[in-house]
Amino acid sequence: MSKFSFFNYRINMRNSHATLGSLPCFIKFNYLSSSSHSKFYSTSTDSPMGHIVSASKSSWYNYYSHKNYDPLTRESFHDELRGFISLYKKQFKEEKFFFMAKIKFNNNDIRSISTVQIGSTDPLEVLRLLEAITSTYMHTHTGISEAVSEPFEYELFSLGDGLPKGNIIFTFKPTSNPSIKTKYEHKSNIKRNKNINLSKKNPLNKFKYNGYTIPNTMDLSQWPNIHFINDGKNAVSLNNIIKSGVDNMTLSFFITINKKYNEITVLLNNTPIFKIKDEKIMSEDDLSSFKRTITENEQDKVYVFENGEMVFFSENVKTSFIKKITRQDLINFENPKIITLDLETRSVPIHPIKEGKDGKEGKVDSIMFPILMSVYNGKFVKSFLFSQSAWETEMMNAFKSIMLRKYDGYKVYTHNFSYFDGIFIIDILSRLGEVKPFMRNGKILKLTFNFTLPNSKRKYTLYFMDSLLILPDSLDKLSNFFNNKVKKLFFPHSFLDDNTIPINYVGKCPDYKYFPKAYTEDFTIEQYQEYANKFKNNNWDLKKELIKYCEIDTIALYQVLVSFQRKIYEKFMIDCTKYPTIPSLAFAIFRKKYLVEDMIPNIKSKLHNIIKLSYFGGICELYKPFGVNIKSYDVNSLYPFAMKYFKMPSGIPKYVKGTLQNIVRFTDSICEVPFGFYNVKVKTPLNLDKPFLPTRLNTPAGTRTAFPLGQWEGWYFSEEILNAMKHGYEFEFIEGYLFEESSMFDEYIDLLYNIKKNSPKESPWYYISKLLMNSLYGRFGLNPEGEEIFITSEEEGDAIIATKEYVTITPLSSGNVLISAKLPEEAFGDMNISVPISSAIAAYSRIHMSHFLTKYSNNIYYIDTDGIKVDIDLDKDEVDSKELGKMKYEYVFEEYTSLGPKVYGGLLYDKKGKLIELVKLRGYSSKLPYNKLKEGLVKDHTLELTQKKWKRKLSESTVYLKNTHLLFL
């Protein structure tokens, strides 16, 4: 159940801008947070005993804890693991097993909290298994909270310590394979080399490079074993013995002496390994203050010493660059090789109803199954009806209709394949051939299906794609945008879900209330009456109308895709069907038409993970909960504005460490803060009315972005630091990464913005240009960590688990298993990503919004990424609906109420002069009366809302419907 306390949280955090000392007890800053970890051994004398059931048709099983833990601690896992081992020994003879830990939260969501481990019943191995499954998550609460879907919508966490509530599940499979070994059986005694050091006789030998100690002075008389030669023009330091394991080696220095600098060649056992250049930075007599440049493999590292202490360090980060696309795509528009597919489902009640802990939360009352599948190839449409009891077999037969030689290489599009249709389809396809999903963040972006035909060994391929990922709007809207000849129909879905009505129903047209958009402007009573008049003779046929509706969907989607494909190709010479998402398509267009070579660095995972700490979303804050005559303004294309008018990070990154003064001094910068990203200690001015610099907080519901007062440490973009300095923020610089500055998006944005500005709002190009403009920036910030997905047999799955690390497994209802294995870093080094670009664009956007936040501080009620609500007219020079970055006036609320970010509403006049209500409530899809929202302003008032939500379950190839309760306090 979602809880939202406006008075206890929002007023304190958003309006009073709590300092660190006054923050609620459950909120801790990342760098200050600490937790007392539970002891390794449980103090419990009684081991819990859950129960074991088969997980699927495979040999995998699930152990379910009987106890619901509040909270789940390390001891909880220890106790349940003991109970599991005890039960396992009674039921299975195999000593070893594959093992994965999960949590079933109180909303019935299930999340894996470990990868697949290989365990055994040996007592020591059990303790090691416990360490493996709890070390990551019990020590960092955010790890668990981030594994929870929509954590803010459910009361999953105990507010006291941030640990989750719920039951424990162990998914496991016994194995007697002698080649399967636990992680600890693989370990052998490894000889450890001692650190490589020079003799410690000289107290100045403090500086180390790659384990080699080098004197941190230009006073050569302090170097070990020094000898001057060639009348003092050169010096040598020979045969300095160092130790490495049992063997001794010698380190030597050959030095060329100049008036202002020394050049040094370093040799290990008489083999040159790197070069040094020491340069004086103070007076000629000051030999303890100097700049040292070490060159190895054509890479330089710079160290600066003052009075013998290192005060600055820098080095270039090895990097490649994002490359242009040079290939030419060819499309035969007479045969674009596209198939469209649509499923219709029917929900049936579950008896007994699956309920949450309190009888309400997470309540699951029905399950969906496919009842119809329609397929369209551009010429013909076929439909297949399914029965509830045999839909899997019937769907297999339906798919055989497109498993044909002539469809080899075709793209099969379904609108919402990733989150809905694919749940039913994936396991079915795995029974017919080889299935290779491409997934990111749990979302199926593309599915490759290889199959063979009878009496043939040749493999054929179909690619299943999600059209919603490339055209993210309803099919109804898309049909209008692209001026389809065939438009989406209306259908009474609620009537279909009434299980008292047979599928062969023929009779009166279903009532208006059964249609999903009833009582809205999208489907008026007049439109319904026009539809119902077609069936005056009570000849409305459920089966016939369902088939017609589904077939029209496939035809409408096909027409949209072909139109989109043609328009993109004619403008950019790119085949859009090669790209699974709209960001990937926008990125391809940019790389093909506008990218300059050797400009944008391809940032790998280690540096990505650091700079990503500076990547925040927009400012979203509530300041005043109620007002009258409140005007709403939105920035015209905020992110494209930032991309066009501001410099972006480019070139080779340079790591720097030191104070800001030394960073400026030793990089020869003319900037107050050199361009790049910095790890800094932040101190806010305590009198700042509306803070705007973000940071991340660990809360019981996971990591959250906040804009507080106080002190903390974090990574930020240089331009955001400069903007904050103007308003009194203070920064202590620790380290950073410097970049060159480049303009790179001007032409891309100019082209698309001009298209948008000159196109009618309901035209295809208005929609396309807006989509491409706003979709590019996020593509640069993709997570570089990849995963490889396998859907295979149990036997092959066991082999994969035994040979790969970081594996998770999902047994499927067919008996096959879905395995996800994290790819090693070197396997995804060419993903063409550059998170500095995304971070900079987001920062520039916050800087732009901070201008309005500070200028209209006394008048602002609410800010949300690219929009504000104020009780004053903005200056005229700041408002222009046609110019990038300017504000555009939306409407005025006669009366306005907000309960928090993404939760607001009010009364306003429409274009016809009629007073209407507008309410926006994150996470709630139904219509909420404004008066209900307004009741949330009353202290101690409780507002409870209920709506149905899908719960996808890939392991069962189904989707559940559950009642979700949102509670506003």
Curated annotation (Swiss-Prot):
Q: Which Gene3D superfamilies match?
A: Helix hairpin bin, Palm domain of DNA polymerase, Ribonuclease H-like superfamily/Ribonuclease H
Molecular function (GO) terms listed?
A: DNA binding; DNA-directed DNA polymerase activity; nucleotide binding
> Any keyword DNA-binding?
yes
Among the GO biological process terms of this entry, one is: DNA replication
Superkingdom, natural source: Eukaryota
Keywords associated with the record: DNA replication, DNA-binding, DNA-directed DNA polymerase, Mitochondrion, Nucleotidyltransferase, Plasmid, Transferase
Q: Name one GO cellular component term.
A: mitochondrion
Q: Where in the cell is it found?
A: Mitochondrion
Q: Which reaction does it catalyse?
A: DNA(n) + a 2'-deoxyribonucleoside 5'-triphosphate = DNA(n+1) + diphosphate
- Report the EC code(s) recorded for this entry: 2.7.7.7
Q: Does the keyword Hydrolase apply?
A: no
The miscellaneous comment for this protein is: This DNA polymerase requires a protein as a primer. The name 'Kalilo' originates from Hawai and means 'fatal disease' (because of the senescence induced by the plasmid).
Similarity comment: Belongs to the DNA polymerase type-B family.
Protein name (record): Probable DNA polymerase
